């Protein structure tokens, strides 16, 4: 742990701040380095010299800190978090994916800043639950905006700059501008060329950063990891190992193995026994993982946990291996029906809030979650979506798409899905995200609504490049209902909706999957009585919804992790 104390513990000067940074991949800049034009003014002869601290998931190269600081945030590549302190002002800048959260609070006249909730707890003046944020967490799996589960402790958002001032005031603003091109590409072939070029650049840079270390690709039965595996093969990546995990006999494991064999890549699987997973989760390994990964804002992302635990214990992979998950800029749209028919402003804002508050099965939960509604309105302001009643939506469907995707990227993706990277760090591994890098964002935002609002173009593109690489057709893992042809499926769903049986049938199918999941998710439900699980699921709760309840109750593991009062 790096414990960087910039003021004496008894110092009450207005410029005081304390950093408690625990990640081993921080780089600390030389005092007195010349700040870029956008930084605060240079320190006076009597004030402390400027301090700079850069986090990356892989150890940065020589000069990386200075070169990154000189770039504008929107031009920086890779995953990063930057701290700049100069003349009493502390600036915390996060990347688009919020790849490394920072937490901050005020203790007397001193700012306390950390990347570890346990460390912050030791230095914060109080450790009390934020009940309003906890209510959102129950329904969403994350806390919105800058709020955390601890009162008066705050967290950095994605793509933002937080400024902490010596007088105790602070502000947060987005540096990212999420806008689709005014004159977008409409040709699928032209868009494919742009997309290929972006992938080439991002993957080649990641391979240089990895510098010969073993590469691990979590290979599911879906599109994203398959596309990444194809691109690694195209670029001649060495020492690539693919893997998957699941209960023995699951179709996703079989498909994953087939993809690896077709690409000529090494592959292994970790078998999951729900009983053993539940037993291990209830012990010290489970609570330790929760503490290392929740970041005071997010439900711990447990999907990879047991597989990673076995890899580390059994030395299945190199100790300094680098994971390349298939997380991508593609597919952040939801409620696609709003792109047609001219929805009202309120319909769009409601759709965004409702989409992120369904974990307990309550479609009206958003109504009593003012923090979530406020985060949606903030996102609307950041993409210039009208927040005042009346008037048409500028840009039609594209305006709607920008808002729904941006709120998703800022909230659920940044705080829950992307928090899954902390699982790799918890076991001492590195990671990188070539399909979420700067070039990929730029490329995707050049595409037309027809090419980007759904995953249809992307699925076709992936099938084509997979065929080029292997000479075989794609086989994807999909839920049983998805195997029905599109036309009959739409007719079936319409009929079920009219008769009132769609919701009941959907819940019955999802309950069966949740209680016997191909990735043994039911193991994490074990602390909740089985009858209560059934009752909650019948009301529409998801597995994740059960976990948020257990986590907040302090019963998900051997001991509570969150503030309990």
Where do the PLM segments sit?
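Adenosyl-5′-phosphate
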Residues: 4-16, 24, 318, 365-565
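Active-site cores of enzymes that catalyze phosphoryl transfer or operate on phosphate-rich substrates
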Residues: 159-162, 220, 346-369, 377-389
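Cysteine-centered catalytic environments shared across enzyme families
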Residues: 1-219, 223-275, 542
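Generic recognition of stable, solvent-exposed alpha-helical segments in well-folded globular domains
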Residues: 157, 190, 194-198, 223, ...
């Amino acid at each position: 742990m790096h414990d960087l104390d910039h003021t004496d513990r008894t110092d009450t000067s207005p410029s005081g701040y304390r950093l408690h940074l625990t990640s081993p991949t921080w780089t600390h800049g030389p005092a007195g380095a010349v700040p870029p034009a956008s930084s605060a003014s240079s320190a006076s002869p009597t004030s402390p010299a400027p301090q700079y601290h850069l986090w990356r998931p892989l150890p940065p190269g020589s000069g990386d800190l200075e070169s990154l600081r000189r770039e504008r945030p929107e031009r920086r590549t890779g995953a990063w978090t930057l701290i700049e302190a100069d003349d009493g002002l502390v600036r915390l800048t996060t990347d688009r994916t919020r790849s490394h959260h920072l937490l901050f609070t005020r203790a007397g006249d001193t700012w306390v800043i950390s990347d570890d909730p346990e460390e912050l707890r030791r230095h914060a003046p109080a450790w009390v639950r934020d009940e309003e944020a906890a209510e959102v967490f129950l329904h969403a799996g994350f806390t919105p905006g800058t709020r955390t589960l601890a009162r008066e402790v705050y967290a950095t958002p994605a793509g933002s700059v937080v400024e902490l001032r010596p007088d105790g005031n602070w502000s947060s603003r987005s540096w990212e501008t999420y806008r689709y091109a005014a004159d977008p590409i409409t040709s699928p072939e032209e868009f494919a060329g742009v997309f290929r070029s972006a992938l080439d650049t991002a993957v080649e840079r990641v391979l240089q950063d990895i510098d010969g270390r073993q590469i691990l690709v979590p290979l599911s039965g879906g599109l994203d990891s398959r596309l990444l595996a194809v691109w690694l093969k195209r670029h001649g990546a060495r020492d690539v190992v693919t893997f998957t995990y699941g209960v023995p006999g699951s179709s996703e494991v079989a498909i994953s193995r087939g993809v690896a064999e077709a690409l000529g890549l090494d592959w292994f699987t970790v078998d999951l026994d729900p009983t053993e997973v539940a037993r291990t989760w209830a012990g010290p390994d489970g609570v330790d993982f929760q503490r290392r990964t929740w970041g005071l804002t997010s439900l711990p992302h447990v999907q990879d946990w047991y597989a990673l635990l076995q890899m580390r214990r059994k030395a299945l992979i190199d100790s300094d291996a680098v994971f390349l998950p298939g997380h991508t800029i593609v597919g952040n749209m939801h409620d696609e029906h709003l792109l047609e028919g001219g929805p009202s402003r309120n319909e769009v804002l409601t759709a965004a809030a409702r989409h992120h508050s369904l974990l307990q099965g309550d479609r009206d939960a958003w109504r009593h979650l003012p923090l979530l509604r406020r985060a949606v309105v903030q996102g609307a302001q950041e993409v210039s979506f009208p927040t005042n009643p009346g008037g048409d939506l500028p840009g039609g469907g594209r305006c709607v798409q920008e808002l729904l995707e941006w709120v998703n990227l800022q909230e659920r993706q940044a705080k829950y899905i992307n928090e899954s990277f902390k699982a790799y760090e918890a076991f001492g591994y590195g990671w990188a995200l070539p399909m979420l890098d700067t070039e990929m964002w730029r490329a995707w935002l050049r595409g037309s609504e027809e090419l980007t609002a759904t995953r249809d173009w992307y699925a076709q593109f992936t099938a084509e490049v997979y065929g080029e690489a292997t000479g075989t057709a794609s086989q994807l893992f999909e839920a049983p209902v998805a195997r029905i042809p599109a036309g009959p499926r739409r007719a079936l769903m319409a009929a079920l909706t009219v008769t009132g049986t769609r919701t009941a049938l959907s819940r019955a199918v999802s309950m069966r999957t949740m209680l016997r999941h191909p990735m043994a998710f039911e193991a994490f439900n074990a602390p909740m009585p089985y009858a209560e699980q059934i009752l909650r699921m019948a009301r529409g709760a998801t597995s994740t919804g059960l976990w948020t309840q257990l986590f907040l109750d302090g019963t998900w593991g051997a001991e509570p992790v969150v503030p309990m009062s």
